[in-house]
C-alpha cells in the first residue's frame, strides 16, 4: 500500500477543490460526485489488506463529508480529514518510505491547493476571459477569439501610450537608480563613520508606503505652495500636469521640434519617476552593499600592491564582481516597471493630462475596474505577461553572458 | 579600499551627506507640514520651524487649555471661561471677537451659548469667552478683529492666520484653548477625527498579521516537505511552484476578483487575506533554510521516533527563526503597504486598509495639507517605529533577498 495512502489523500483534496470549482461555477455537481467517489475508492484500495477499525471510521467520515459537501461546500473538507483519521490507525503498520509519501503530500497540499486556486487556475482563466467579448457581470458574452488582442495591438493608441511610458520608465529609472545606488554603496563601503546612520536614512523611503510617500511628493510638487518651485525659483510651475515631453521641452529653444514618442516622457511622468527612484534607491543600496561585502578583500589588497588607483579597482574588481547583484536588480526593476501603479494613481489620479502618465498597470485598472471590461483588461494582462516572459528570457540570454558569477 | 586620504574623505562625506539630505528631506517636510497651520503651510517662502514647535507658544497653549479643559488636550467645557489677553499698550478701538460658525450650519451651539466680554486692563485688552451652555466642545475656534491703528500689539498665543480686512487685521485661531498636545498635534487630532483611522489601522494590522502567520504556517509545511521528505511527485510539485513565480500579479487581478465575487467574498477580510496566503517566496526562503540544516539532526530525531510533523515543529522551525523573521517582515510590509488589491476588492469604508483610507483622505482633505501630512505621518508611523526597533532584521532580510 503506502503510496496508496498519498493517492487517497490527494484524491480527497482534489474532491474538495472540485467542490470549490463547482461553487465557482467552473464545474458541475457531476464532477464533484466523480471526484468524491474516486477518493473513497482510493480509500477502500488503501484499506485493502490491513482493515483496521480507525481506517473504516476515516472512510465513514469521508463518506459523510461527501454527502454533506453537496449542501455545504466546506463540509467536503471532511473527506481529507477522514484520511488523517485513517492514518492515525495505520501509522504503526506503514513502512518508512510510505510514511514519507504520505507526509510529504500532506504537508505540501495546503500550499499547492492555495496556489492552484488563486494563481494557476486564475492565470488560465484570465487567458480564457481574454477570448471573450466584453465579459462582465451583466449579460452573456460570446467567444470572439483574438479580437481583443487585435484591437489592443493595432487600434488602441492608449495601450501604445502606456507601453511607451513603460519603456521610458525603464530607460530612465533603471540606469539612474542602479548608477546612483552603486555610487552610494561603494562610498558607504569605504570605511565611513556613521555607516549605520547613512544606511538608515537611505533605506527609510523604501519601507514607507508608496501611498504616503506619493502624498508627500504631491505636496512638494504643488504648483503654488510646493517646496520644489520655491527651491528652483519657478513659481506656479505645474509639475504634475505638464504633458509636454522633456526632450521636446529641452530641444525647443534650439529650434528642434519633437513630437509623439520621441518627445520623451512628459514632465509629469519624469516627476513620477524621480519619486520612484527616491523610493526604491534604499533597497538597491542595501542589496548592492551586501554584494560588495561579499567581494573578498584579497583582490583589493593584491591590486593595491600592484599600484592600482581607486578608479581602476572600482572598474576592474568591484564592477565585474558586483555584476550578479546588478543583474538581479536590473531584472527586478524591469519587472517592477510593468507594475507601477500606486504613485501614478496618487500623483496623477486620472493618468495625467492627455494620459501622459498612463502606465500599463493603471490602464489595466481603468479598463477592468472603471470600464468593467474584464475581457479587454485580461487581454492586456496576458500581453504584459508574455512581454515580461520574453524580456526575462532575452535578458537571460543576452545580458547574463556578461555577468561574472565566479570570483 | 583606501582613498587618497584627506581630499577623498571629504568628497565621500560630502556626497553621502548631500545624498542622505535629499533622501530624508521628504520626511522632514511631511513632519514639518503636519505641524503647520494652513496659512503657515501656504507661505511663499518655506517655514522651516513651525510656530507650533516653539516652546514659547506651549506655555500659553497649556494655560489657555487648562482654562477651557485640560492642560494637555485643552477643550471648551461647559461652564469654563477662556481668557485671551491682547497687549496693546494704550486703549484704542475695542477688538471684536467672534466664534466662526461652520458654513452651511443652521445653528451653532458653541457660538450661541458663548458669552464674550471685552475689558481694558492695564495696557491690555482682556477678552473672556465663557461657555454658558450645557455642551462641551473639543475645539474653540476664535476670530479676532483688531484695528490697524494700533502701532503694535502682542498676543499670548500666535494666531494660525492673519489677514487684512479693511481697517482691521483679522486674526484667527483654529483652537484657542488647545493645551500643549492639542496645540502641537492639532492636525493629527483633526485628521484622526476626520476619518476612522482607528478602524483602518485595525484592518491593516489584522489582515497583515493573519497573512504573515497563516502564510508562515503554510510555507513552513511545504518548505519542510520539499527540503526534507522524499516523496513521489516531489519534482512535479517543485516545478509547479517555480512556474507560479512567473505569473505577474496583474494577470491575477481580474480572475481573482471574479472568483471572490462568485464566492461572495468581496468586501470581506477573506478577500484581503486568502488569495495571498500561499507565498512562493516564503516556500523558497524556508526551504533554503531547511536544506542548510545538517541531516544528522533529523536522522537522530527519526531514530528517537519523532514523526515528520514533530521534526518540523521541534527542529526545523526553531532553527529557522531568522528566515521566518525575514519572511514576516516582507509579507507584513507588502500587505500593509498594498494599495491596488484593497482598492479593487473592498468598497465600504469599514473594510478600508490604512493605505486605502489615506488615499480616500487625500481626496477629501483637499488643500488642507497640514491634516493630509499628519495622516500620512500616522500611516507610516508603525512601520517606521518597527524599522527602528528591528533595523538589523529589516536590512539583513533585504540584503538576503539579493544574494542567490
Which positions does each model-derived feature cover?
Chain A
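Transmembrane alpha-helical segments of polytopic membrane transport and secretion proteins
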Residues: 1-12, 18, 22, 41-58, ...
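Extended hydrophobic/Leu-rich segments
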Residues: 11, 17, 34, 39-40, ...
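Alpha-helical transmembrane segments of multi-pass membrane proteins
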Residues: 15-22, 117-123
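Short, flexible coil/linker elements and helix-boundary hinge sites characteristic
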Residues: 24-27, 49, 98, 233, ...
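Alpha-helical transmembrane segments of polytopic membrane proteins
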Residues: 27-38, 72-82, 171
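Hydrophobic, membrane-facing alpha-helical anchors
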Residues: 33-41, 124, 352
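A structural signal for multi-pass alpha-helical bundles of membrane permease subunits
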Residues: 100-407
Amino acid at each position: 500500500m503506502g503510496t496508496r495512502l498519498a493517492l487517497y489523500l490527494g484524491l480527497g483534496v482534489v474532491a474538495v477543490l472540485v467542490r470549490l470549482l463547482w461553487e465557482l461555477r467552473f464545474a458541475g455537481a457531476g464532477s464533484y460526485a466523480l471526484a468524491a467517489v474516486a477518493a473513497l475508492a482510493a480509500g477502500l484500495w488503501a484499506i485493502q489488506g490491513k482493515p483496521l477499525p480507525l481506517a473504516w471510521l476515516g472512510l465513514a467520515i469521508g463518506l459523510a463529508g461527501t454527502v454533506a459537501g453537496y449542501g455545504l461546500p466546506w463540509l467536503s473538507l471532511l473527506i481529507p480529514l477522514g484520511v488523517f483519521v485513517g492514518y492515525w490507525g495505520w501509522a504503526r503498520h506503514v513502512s518508512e518510505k510510505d510514511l514519507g509519501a504520505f507526509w510529504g503530500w500532506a504537508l505540501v497540499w495546503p500550499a499547492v491547493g492555495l496556489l492552484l486556486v488563486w494563481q494557476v487556475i486564475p492565470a488560465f482563466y484570465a487567458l480564457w476571459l481574454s477570448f471573450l467579448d466584453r465579459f462582465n457581470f451583466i449579460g452573456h458574452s460570446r467567444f470572439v477569439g483574438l479580437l481583443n488582442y487585435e484591437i489592443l495591438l493595432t487600434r488602441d493608441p492608449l495601450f501604445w501610450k502606456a507601453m511607451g511610458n513603460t519603456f521610458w520608465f525603464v530607460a530612465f529609472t533603471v540606469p539612474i537608480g542602479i548608477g546612483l545606488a552603486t555610487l552610494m554603496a561603494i562610498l558607504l563601503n569605504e570605511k565611513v563613520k556613521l555607516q549605520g546612520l547613512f544606511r538608515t536614512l537611505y533605506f527609510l523611503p523604501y519601507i514607507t508606503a508608496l501611498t504616503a510617500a506619493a502624498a508627500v511628493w504631491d505636496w512638494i510638487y504643488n504648483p503654488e505652495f510646493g517646496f520644489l518651485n520655491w527651491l528652483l525659483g519657478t513659481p506656479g510651475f505645474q509639475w504634475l500636469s505638464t504633458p509636454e515631453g522633456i526632450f521636446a521641452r529641452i530641444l525647443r529653444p534650439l529650434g528642434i521640434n519633437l513630437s509623439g514618442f520621441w518627445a520623451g516622457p512628459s514632465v509629469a511622468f519624469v516627476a513620477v519617476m524621480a519619486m520612484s527612484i527616491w523610493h526604491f534607491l534604499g533597497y538597491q543600496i542595501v542589496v548592492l552593499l551586501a554584494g560588495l561585502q561579499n567581494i573578498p578583500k584579497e583582490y583589493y589588497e593584491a591590486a593595491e600592491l600592484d599600484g592600482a588607483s581607486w578608479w581602476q579597482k572600482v572598474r576592474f574588481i568591484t564592477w565585474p564582481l558586483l555584476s550578479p547583484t546588478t543583474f538581479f536588480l536590473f531584472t527586478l526593476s524591469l519587472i517592477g516597471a510593468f507594475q507601477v501603479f500606486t504613485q501614478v494613481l496618487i500623483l496623477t489620479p486620472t493618468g495625467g493630462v492627455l494620459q501622459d502618465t498612463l502606465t500599463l498597470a493603471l490602464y489595466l485598472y481603468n479598463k477592468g475596474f472603471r470600464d468593467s471590461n474584464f475581457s479587454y483588461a485580461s487581454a492586456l494582462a496576458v500581453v504584459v505577461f508574455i512581454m515580461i516572459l520574453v524580456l526575462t528570457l532575452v535578458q537571460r540570454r543576452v545580458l547574463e553572458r556578461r555577468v561574472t558569477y565566479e570570483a | 579600499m583606501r582613498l587618497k586620504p584627506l581630499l577623498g574623505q571629504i568628497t565621500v562625506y560630502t556626497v553621502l551627506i548631500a545624498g542622505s539630505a535629499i533622501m530624508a528631506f521628504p520626511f522632514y517636510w511631511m513632519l514639518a507640514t503636519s505641524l503647520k497651520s494652513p496659512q503657515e503651510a501656504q507661505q511663499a517662502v518655506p517655514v522651516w520651524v513651525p510656530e507650533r514647535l516653539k516652546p514659547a507658544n506651549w506655555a500659553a497653549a497649556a494655560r489657555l487649555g487648562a482654562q477651557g479643559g485640560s492642560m494637555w488636550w485643552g477643550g471648551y467645557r461647559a461652564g469654563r471661561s477662556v481668557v485671551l489677553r491682547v497687549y496693546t499698550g494704550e486703549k484704542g478701538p475695542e477688538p471684536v471677537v467672534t466664534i466662526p460658525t461652520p458654513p452651511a450650519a443652521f445653528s451653532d451651539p458653541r457660538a450661541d451659548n458663548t458669552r464674550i466680554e471685552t475689558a481694558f486692563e492695564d495696557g491690555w485688552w482682556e477678552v473672556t469667552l465663557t461657555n454658558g451652555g450645557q455642551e462641551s466642545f473639543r475645539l474653540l475656534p476664535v476670530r479676532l478683529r483688531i484695528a490697524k491703528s494700533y502701532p503694535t500689539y502682542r498676543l499670548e498665543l500666535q494666531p494660525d492666520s492673519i489677514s487684512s480686512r479693511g481697517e482691521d487685521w483679522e486674526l484667527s485661531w483654529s483652537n484657542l484653548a488647545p493645551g500643549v498636545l492639542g496645540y502641537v498635534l492639532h492636525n493629527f487630532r483633526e485628521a484622526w477625527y476626520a476619518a476612522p483611522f482607528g478602524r483602518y489601522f485595525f484592518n491593516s494590522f489584522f489582515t497583515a498579521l493573519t497573512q504573515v502567520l497563516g502564510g508562515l504556517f503554510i510555507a513552513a509545511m511545504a518548505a519542510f516537505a520539499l527540503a526534507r521528505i522524499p516523496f513521489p511527485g516531489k519534482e512535479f510539485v517543485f516545478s509547479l511552484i517555480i512556474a507560479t513565480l512567473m505569473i505577474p500579479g496583474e494577470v491575477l487581478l481580474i480572475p481573482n476578483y471574479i472568483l471572490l465575487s462568485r464566492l461572495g467574498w468581496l468586501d470581506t477580510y477573506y478577500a484581503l487575506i486568502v488569495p495571498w496566503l500561499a507565498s512562493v517566496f516564503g516556500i523558497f526562503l524556508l526551504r533554503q533554510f531547511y536544506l542548510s540544516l545538517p541531516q544528522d539532526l533529523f536522522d537522530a530525531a527519526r531514530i528517537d521516533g519523532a514523526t515528520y510533523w514533530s521534526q518540523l515543529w521541534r527542529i526545523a522551525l526553531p532553527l529557522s527563526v531568522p528566515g521566518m523573521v525575514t519572511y514576516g517582515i516582507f509579507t507584513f510590509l507588502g500587505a500593509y503597504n498594498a494599495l491596488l488589491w484593497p482598492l479593487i476588492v473592498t468598497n465600504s469604508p469599514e473594510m478600508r486598509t490604512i493605505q486605502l483610507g489615506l488615499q480616500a483622505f487625500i481626496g477629501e482633505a483637499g488643500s488642507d495639507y497640514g491634516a493630509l501630512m499628519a495622516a500620512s505621518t500616522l500611516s507610516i508611523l508603525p512601520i517606521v517605529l518597527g524599522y527602528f526597533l528591528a533595523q538589523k532584521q529589516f536590512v539583513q532580510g533585504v540584503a538576503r533577498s539579493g544574494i542567490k
